[in-house]
Every structure is written in structure tokens, then in C-alpha cells.
């Protein structure tokens, strides 16, 4: 069965995490029997610089909000949803390690980062004896293969990077619902 539940602060402006949290609570499953992830970057509706990105304030507050919405004590995986050119990578790596040390997250990763950005995070982590990102969540399907199959090939070996992909059916394009004409009302 399914035991991995992927979430993000931006999905329905946080409402999807509330729904997921209610389901997890209602089901009463042993917490060790499933994996829950969340992602931070885009925020959950706020537009101020401290409500977006990978700065320390936003990452810590977004993690706390995700834990509350999901009604869990920790996240198994916590992703930096996009790279942040406005925040030094050192600040992001330090903050993610702070969240690990606090027991709020077990592992941290990235989503839609380049191999170079991931390696930079690992170099910073190594320099300061911290934990670098352990997984990347790229788009991967028959239309988007280069990053997973070529760009990341070396870092799989170098740092043991794992992946959890998104959009394996290319947002529905690879299903039969798009054979012929596009159905009315689709994106």
C-alpha cells in the first residue's frame, strides 16, 4: 500500500496539509509506519520577503506550520522547494541542520535544484560538518529525462543522492485522456 505522503506549504496555500493531517489523525496509524514530507519556498499566501524563500525565518516558521497542519511531531523529509538566489546557501544548510538537531525533520532535500547547486550545498555542509541534502525531487517523465538520467548521474555516486520524482505522467499528458482533442475545461 501507499505509505509516503508528499506535501508542500504552497499546495492549496497549506490547506492540503490540513486535510492530510486530519486523515493521518483519523486513521490512527503508527507514526513509524508511514513517511511524510513537506516543502518550503513559495510560502502559503504571504508575499513579504520573510514569508518566502529559503531564509532562516521562513524555513523555521514554515516547518512549524507544516507540523501543526499535518498534526505530526516530525517530518521524515523536508525539501527546499526551489533554489533561492536571495539567501546564502550557508544560511539554508545551517537552518536545515538546525531543524534536524531539533528533531523536527529527519532528512532534508531539494526540489528542482541543479547538480551544481546540490553539490554547493554539500560542500558547505562538509566544511561546517553538517548534513547536506540527501534527496532531490525533480520532474521526471519521458519528456523530462535529462536531469535525472544525465545531470545527476555523478552525484548519485558522489554523495549518495536519492530521488523522489514529480509529474511522472507529465501532468496528465501521458494518460489517454488527451488522445485526440483536449477535453473541455482542462489545463
Question: What kind of feature is each model-predicted range?
Answer:
Residues 30-34, 38, 73-77, 106-107, ...:
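Short acidic capping loops at alpha-helix termini that bridge into adjacent secondary structure
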